[in-house]
Amino acid sequence: MGKKHKKHKSDRHFYEEYVEKPLKLVLKVGGSEVTELSTGSSGHDSSLFEDRSDHDKHKDRKRKKRKKGEKQAPGEEKGRKRRRVKEDKKKRDRDRAENEVDRDLQCHVPIRLDLPPEKPLTSSLAKQEEVEQTPLQEALNQLMRQLQRKDPSAFFSFPVTDFIAPGYSMIIKHPMDFSTMKEKIKNNDYQSIEELKDNFKLMCTNAMIYNKPETIYYKAAKKLLHSGMKILSQERIQSLKQSIDFMSDLQKTRKQKERTDACQSGEDSGCWQREREDSGDAETQAFRSPAKDNKRKDKDVLEDKWRSSNSEREHEQIERVVQESGGKLTRRLANSQCEFERRKPDGTTTLGLLHPVDPIVGEPGYCPVRLGMTTGRLQSGVNTLQGFKEDKRNRVTPVLYLNYGPYSSYAPHYDSTFANISKDDSDLIYSTYGEDSDLPNNFSISEFLATCQDYPYVMADSLLDVLTKGGHSRSLQDLDMSSPEDEGQTRALDTAKEAEITQIEPTGRLESSSQDRLTALQAVTTFGAPAEVFDSEEAEVFQRKLDETTRLLRELQEAQNERLSTRPPPNMICLLGPSYREMYLAEQVTNNLKELTQQVTPGDVVSIHGVRKAMGISVPSPIVGNSFVDLTGECEEPKETSTAECGPDAS
């Protein structure tokens, strides 16, 4: 006999756990009739009892299964298949019963209308805005989305403030970012794709100007500029026009605008011609192949047309100005031998800086020195001139002698850790420069030069003469000549001052006290120099203006030195711009110089040669005929005269 299976505690209370409290539904239809439904209906009860009976059968089946497993082991697979089939059948029966219960409940529950949710107003407004956008705005928005995808870090999404980047507003005068560009597109401020392209370039260049090349912002701006220029290239835009509908509409609207503008400006004859040209261009573009050669040819043809039309307009304007001048202007060429050296093919030229001192006309031996001759080129990313720094390899480090004091016989006498020359060379240097006090025959270069007469000084002067082409010796001669004259002048001034003081004392006794004070004050203010006497009031005003301009120039120089001597912050590449005080002083100096130059002739300000050189005008040298001088004839004539004069005396 098999062992009787013990009933589990959970099986005893299965019925109590399975039964749930039925739900009660109260339905009001028409305001009077009330129908009550409860989940404890007959169909539901029957299904409930069926589930219980199925559960009991399932338990009995488990028991039988165990008994069979103990008795029969080989036929397990067939029994499993049968069980699976029976379980599937029971599951289907359960699902059918549950579906029937749900249908009964749906019949008693009143029908409720499901209204669609209200659409938000923002979406409708956004759709209206999208519908109202012009083809140009849609095209620009499409390009902006492509450009912003190339900025995953969102460095250029919002404007940069001085709080984020110190001194940004002082360096970058025209900031730009993606949000500002979007706002411009929304306000319809862009008239073409080229304007968007210019603003995109400005945004990237601003970041590259403010940040150093080693920063991530500089690298991100450079990468964004490279990829953005590919997106905004003509080939990419042409491909977008072929693939997107509103890009093709963009070309039509632009042509219509050009036609209306041309017709409104009064160019009726040219309007019809442009329409024909535009229609022809559209037809050619429709049948044109996308080859690069054809595109280049079409571009060249358009550029030639544009240049020819511009030249015709310029000729018409010149003719109109000549006619309106009333004979003052003519088209004939001037019969002059002057020409412009720096004249460009389009007829324009450049104006150089006017400077009265010229190396050709000015003093002999004068040579202008430019800043580029004294210093090299500025490195990229460096905002200051590099000072002179001696190379470490050129520096000589001798052996260092050590002194430990007494009782140090076995200690090392010298240290050659950092020396780059030998001990013998170090001893030679120490003996020559007089640094070693132990040697009795030590001497220095200064003592050697003092005791060896003037030969080294002559060598140094001759070397300087070779370098300056004789300028050093001339300057020494001028100094020697000016020294006795200066001494004589100082002596004369001292005697004149003493005489004036002696003259002031007796005259002061005779004159009134006010005159004494006035003369004493004049002597103090002028430091003994004679007071300036002007011929007219205009000359006095002119001199005052010059003095004021000199003072303003000094103040401007001090302000500039103060600004340029301050160390810029490390995050700034460019120098700080001029301050408000510098701008104000420069404006005052300019106004004063304008007033002064208006009161004099141009020849007093600058020479004719300087003006011509600044404008790039070259005057041909005069043709020299038989202007050579026979030196032999001139030398023979005085000999004849001398013999003629000496003849009577000799006779």
Swiss-Prot record:
InterPro entries recorded: Bromodomain (IPR001487), Bromodomain-like_sf (IPR036427), Bromodomain_contain_prot (IPR051831), DUF3512 (IPR021900)
UniProt biased composition (Polar residues): 35-45
Subcellular location: Nucleus; Chromosome
SMART domains: BROMO (SM00297)
Sites bearing N6-acetyllysine, chain numbering: 328
Covalent cross-link Glycyl lysine isopeptide (Lys-Gly) (interchain with G-Cter in SUMO2), where: 21, 127, 186, 197, 201, 212, 241, 305, 344, 389
Principal location: nucleus
Chain's role: Acts both as coactivator and as corepressor. May play a role in chromatin remodeling. Transcriptional corepressor that down-regulates the expression of target genes. Binds to target promoters, leading to increased histone H3 acetylation at 'Lys-9' (H3K9ac). Binds to the ESR1 promoter. Recruits BRCA1 and POU2F1 to the ESR1 promoter. Coactivator for TP53-mediated activation of transcription of a set of target genes. Required for TP53-mediated cell-cycle arrest in response to oncogene activation.
Record-given protein name: Bromodomain-containing protein 7
